[in-house]
Amino acid sequence: MYPPRRIEIPCKPGVYRFEDENGRILYVGKAKNLRNRLGSYFTNARRGRRISYMLSISKKVGWTCVADDIEALRLEYSWIKEFAPPCNVKLKDDKAYPFLAVTIGEQVPRLLITRRKIQYATHFGPYPKVFHLRETVSLLHKIFQIRTCSPTNYKRAIASGMPCFEGQINKCFGPCSLKTTHLQYQKRIKNLMAFLEGQSSSLLESLKKKMLKASKNKEYEEAAILRDKIQAAQTVLSRSAVLLDETVSADFIAVVSDNSIASVQCFRVIAGRIKSVYSWHFEQQEDQSASELLSQSIIQVYDKLSLPKRIVLFDKPSYLSALSAHLNDKNIDRSLEIEIVYHPNEQERRLLETVKDNALSELERHRLRRSSDYTERHRSLFELQKYLNLNSLPVRIECFDISHLLGTNTSGSMVVFENGEPKKSAYRHFNIHIDQNNDTASMFSLICRRLRSLESVAQDSPDYPHLMIIDGGKPQLSAAVGALQEVGLKIPVFALSKRLEELWSPGVKTSLILPPNSESLFLLQKIRDESHRFALKQQTRRREAYLTSELFRIPGLGKQKVMQLLRRFSSFAEIRQASIEDISALPGFGVKTAEKIKECAEAFSLK
């Protein structure tokens, strides 16, 4: 088996699978970083006998990205049980991983960790590490104050009329000592279950409102307790994976595109488990809307796949009634109507985010394969020469872009492609010193400076451009043409505007639109996107320097505290929106310091 190119593999958590020539899954594994993990299979000479055998008969390796390593564990666990890959080590039983259980069958439910399924309890998991799960239970206990004691201790507390130890220190809501009614306690259990099932936004919103109210009333101790609960909830959420009820059976579909190629990803979920992952690429038609693309993709997907009972989407597809009729006509089971859902609940939305991430990853992988192909790259150059009517092959292409920082600090960027590939050593940044915020004048200045550096360069030199691309429209193109005339050089120049991917040529009133899905258009898009990325990188550096200098204006802030603020808040807008409790929670920041920072941030009117 030929190993995949390292650059094609995402640096994300996920589950990978090796398959034989018949598509049978031989091995399933999980990884915190797919690129590093899969790379180790093909670079490590000291492999075990089992892995060496698996690689010798494998013909294909695939992967599915997920949100975190917990979700990776759950998907791996599900697929090992579903497909029984012959090269995986067999688990003795389901006790290998711990679960979180809520004993809803008891009159006063409790929260506990278990390695085996408990009758009349709702289970969440499995989880990869039991010590992480213990921390999670501790955090959930802090938020909901749910009983965790054993039935024996609970009965003893009821008999004595005194709460258990956790009830005495207010870590438990105290159902054993009748500090709360049965109805109030059941409400807490209901909130806990909703939180664990992914319905977290309402709880966080409620806690934040209470915290702000306490802060406004100067009840800082109560506000601090609520702040700790919010932080605990956010920590639990960061460790949680997508949890689907066993009753959920549906296809989750996401479509992303770059205006020429659409990437479609489908997760087939049966009884709450991801059973299969499918991926395709389609050519996107010209002027096709997102909803039309979604409808077209669904039709093509179910020309290949069997129909599910339910299809879950982010957005409403176009011609929904006609699409539903088409799918139901194809459905063999006439008694069951296919449901298309485009308002997913919070739980389903989280899984759809994972599906969308995989679609984006596959689209990028497709683009990388396409751009790395030598034949395709040279075809794109020949196409450009033909469509732009150039005298020679555009071996060296330079692209120019103008960017700003908060409407000031104008800068220009230049990226260079040679033979259809980026030449990063030739990239350049230019600081533009123009009094007014004028893109046209800035572009004129940028091109003049670049052209003057070429006056001593021979036209047959590899450093001399064969084509200049301006990121913008007619005004920016006019500025570039003016710069060429002023310096006295003749280099083909075109402007590329993003709205319709139009190319503007000097002296021509109408724009040129390259054929969609052509290699030449793909190359120009890649050059333009690289120009944006390079410009954004420089502006990010300048923004950080600007932000730091403005923070030093606040009295009483030294270098260490400024760096702490920058790590916690990315902008002055965030500092102004933050509560005094949020700022004072930073190490070394008291309430007075936090109040001073808030006052100064408002006074400086910083953005």
Swiss-Prot record:
CDD domains attached to this UniProt entry: GIY-YIG_UvrC_Cho
GO terms of molecular function: DNA binding; excinuclease ABC activity
Keyword Ribonucleoprotein in record: no
One example of a Gene Ontology biological process annotation: nucleotide-excision repair
Segments passing through the bilayer: none
Domain GIY-YIG: 11-89
Ranges for domain UVR: 201-236
Subcellular location: Cytoplasm
DNA damage listed as a keyword: yes
Gene Ontology cellular component annotations, sorted alphabetically: cytoplasm; excinuclease repair complex
Principal location: cytoplasm
Top-level taxon: Bacteria
Keywords in alphabetical order: Cytoplasm, DNA damage, DNA excision, DNA repair, Excision nuclease, SOS response
NCBIfam families per the UniProt record, alphabetical: PRK00558.1-5 (NF001824), uvrC (TIGR00194)
Role noted for this protein: The UvrABC repair system catalyzes the recognition and processing of DNA lesions. UvrC both incises the 5' and 3' sides of the lesion. The N-terminal half is responsible for the 3' incision and the C-terminal half is responsible for the 5' incision.
Family, per entry: Belongs to the UvrC family.
PANTHER family according to UniProt: UVRABC SYSTEM PROTEIN C (PTHR30562:SF1), UVRC/OXIDOREDUCTASE (PTHR30562)
Subunit structure and binding partners: Interacts with UvrB in an incision complex.
Cross-referenced HAMAP family: UvrC
Identification of the protein by name: UvrABC system protein C
